[in-house]
Amino acid sequence: MEKLARKSVQKLTPYLSARRIGGTGDVWLNANESPFDNEYRTNFARLNRYSDCQPKALIAAYAAYAGVKPEQTLTSRGADEGIELLIRAFCEPNEDAILYCPPTYGMYSVSAETIGVERKTVPLTEDWQLDLSGIEANLDKVKLVFVCSPNNPTGNLVKREDIIALLEMTKDRAIVVMDEAYIDFCPEASTVDLLAQYSNLAILRTLSKAFALAGLRCGFTLANEELINVLLKVIAPYPVPVPVAEIATQALSEAGLARAKFQVLDLNANRAYLQVGLSMIAGLEVFEGWGNYLLVKFPNGDELFKAAWESGIILRNSPIKDCVRISVGSRDECEKTLGFIRNYYS
């Protein structure tokens, strides 16, 4: 059957998510998931009816949380669908291109390749910031520029002045897509205030991380109303199941937001605990992180990753040499991981 598939799909290497990689253990710190398992009320009385394309209560709740108008808000099956919608809506296959800056999230590349859109890369600088001159030199045919901040897997924030410079550079040429999947851990760094000034800005958000709803698959795209209307032309007719909309709306209620804020404070404290503990181990380089994960450089990253895996501590290997990404879990999970790494290098 594979020979019937499009040639580009035959050559495609799928994104290796944490679940596809697998593993067995009792400490799962490989997918930047929340350790909190919150309870929600669900109503299954209306499952015989299709959901609204854009459930009004959910859109209103997230728009209020994000500080934008409902008309500037689109919900989808995770932020990953937002990536795909943007590429499908704005890029002509075999004609246009996207641009992204590795090391960064892998789905920009996979989504573009699946659709048949050229992928241009301009690597981040040594301190993992944007190479603005390199981006400018490669903007020909580019319709979308993806920037992740906090960046996954490095954890750093992209300089605000560089984001503004990029928006100015791409005016009337391309859309800058800010992936803010982890912005709830550092909301002061959001670019949402720039939407009023730049019509070529789109922002991706998710409930998977800070809201502890990775299994729900609920994301958002924030942009000007004209851009949102373009995305509504290509989105599926019923993208958000009824239970998803109900649970997500509960998570964005006053009580839900208070709980999420408390849990973010807890996870940020655990990140600081893990960062300090790891930095005290000789030979390790711990990079400052702003999301719910840390990137750590080990003397022998692959060996450390394998040893942890065999001990039931599932971390995430990185394309960066000798680096491993560690999600911030519960304090108990952080203590177990820190204890294992200490013993490994003792």
UniProtKB/Swiss-Prot annotation:
Its EC number is 2.6.1.9. Keywords: Amino-acid biosynthesis, Aminotransferase, Histidine biosynthesis, Pyridoxal phosphate, Transferase. It catalyses: L-histidinol phosphate + 2-oxoglutarate = 3-(imidazol-4-yl)-2-oxopropyl phosphate + L-glutamate. It holds the Pfam family Aminotran_1_2. InterPro entries: Aminotrans_II_pyridoxalP_BS, Aminotransferase_I/II_large, HisP_aminotrans, PyrdxlP-dep_Trfase, PyrdxlP-dep_Trfase_major, PyrdxlP-dep_Trfase_small. Its cofactor is pyridoxal 5'-phosphate. The modification N6-(pyridoxal phosphate)lysine is found at residue 209. CDD domains: AAT_like (cd00609). Pathway: Amino-acid biosynthesis; L-histidine biosynthesis; L-histidine from 5-phospho-alpha-D-ribose 1-diphosphate: step 7/9. The keyword Amino-acid biosynthesis applies. One of its GO terms (biological process) is L-histidine biosynthetic process. GO terms for molecular function: histidinol-phosphate transaminase activity; pyridoxal phosphate binding. Homodimer. Belongs to the class-II pyridoxal-phosphate-dependent aminotransferase family. Histidinol-phosphate aminotransferase subfamily. This is Histidinol-phosphate aminotransferase. It comes from Vibrio vulnificus (strain YJ016).
